[in-house]
């Protein structure tokens, strides 16, 4: 099989391009995939060649239902070295915002799937670009949320500032989406205000606290309920072991 038949229907998607990369859709052996490659002006520069290789190494082992999966890293005629990913053709959140097509289903996925994907990235200590509407895709067929630009380097840990910036950027993106769909949900608006507070100390401490707030629950109330449950369990055990407990009826 020649390279011409291996790769067919290669089409540039300029709306999906990133700072250093061009994005294409194509068929590989007849199956639709996405292609990420360096822009022409960077393809022969060793620094940028190393950058795309590092991104492939960082992302290859990531596995999450709301993160685009990487399949391969190979040379493609006229495009050079490329990262090949699953086909995630659909609309970016930016396009939906611009066209005022954001609905409550999109908002619901941002409350759950998006936060879960962010948590997965943080747990794996992946340094990543700022979250933005251009990096969030709702797939064409079933509308699943997918992150398409999730990281370029794995580190021993992420800094406190990086974690806080994630929460800030999430608030900005959620706020734009709420504005686009005309949603005035008081809980979500409160979350946006706290995420984007100019003082990082006033933002949510972590994604777990953010998730609880999105569900309309506070972490403090959660811990109070846990404490009450534990106290009741201690009382029950003490009663069961007490010599004054009534003897069972035979």
Language model features with spans:
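AlphaC helix of the protein kinase catalytic domain
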Residues: 92-102
